[in-house]
């Protein structure tokens, strides 16, 4: 996608309190774009003034959400609860604050995972169970003695290239999440 913002109604203001340079996210997003990540949030530094009072420099960013102009995956419906329909279009986030969300779970290795899409109102019990099972199967494959096996190891459960891109960008940016 080009470097202009997505046409959407939802945006995120990031305070970057822990980044006094105000450069970490813009640099990470640029590295992400250059690494060929399928979605990288657009962002701009903005000065926020509320009721005439200066509040600081923030980053106005695309919100990470399922949308053709953002994370372009199949939008799940409650009817998508069987067969191939059950397997597609989920947006999850590994997040230490997952326990504060409605749709979340802790993986078999204690990793907190928030289900971002489908929304709390739309996700079904079967869809939640599918996501949790898929995540736990990935963990089992990663931690197994045969983790390098092409058919039973982690490669059969994830897109290794996109995971490595995400990991490297996070490391270069000093992302602690």
Model region roles, listed by residue range:
Residues 1-176:
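Phosphate/dinucleotide-binding and metal-coordinating scaffold of catalytic cores
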């Amino acid at each position: 996608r080009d470097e202009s913002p997505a046409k959407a109604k939802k945006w995120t203001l990031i305070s970057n309190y822990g980044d006094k340079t105000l450069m970490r996210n813009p640099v990470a997003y640029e590295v992400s774009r250059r690494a060929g990540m399928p979605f990288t949030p657009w962002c701009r530094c903005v000065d926020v003034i509320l009721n005439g009072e200066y509040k600081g420099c923030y980053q106005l960013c695309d919100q990470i959400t399922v949308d053709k102009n953002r994370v372009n995956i199949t939008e799940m419906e409650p009817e998508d609860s069987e067969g191939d329909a059950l397997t597609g279009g989920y947006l999850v986030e590994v997040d230490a604050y997952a326990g504060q969300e409605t749709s979340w779970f802790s993986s078999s290795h204690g990793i907190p995972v928030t289900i971002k899409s489908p929304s709390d109102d739309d996700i079904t019990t079967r869809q939640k169970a599918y996501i949790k099972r898929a995540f736990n199967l990935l963990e089992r494959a990663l931690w197994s003695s045969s983790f390098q096996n092409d058919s039973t190891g982690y490669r059969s459960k994830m897109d290794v290239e996109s995971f490595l891109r995400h990991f490297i960008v996070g490391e270069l940016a000093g992302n602690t999440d």
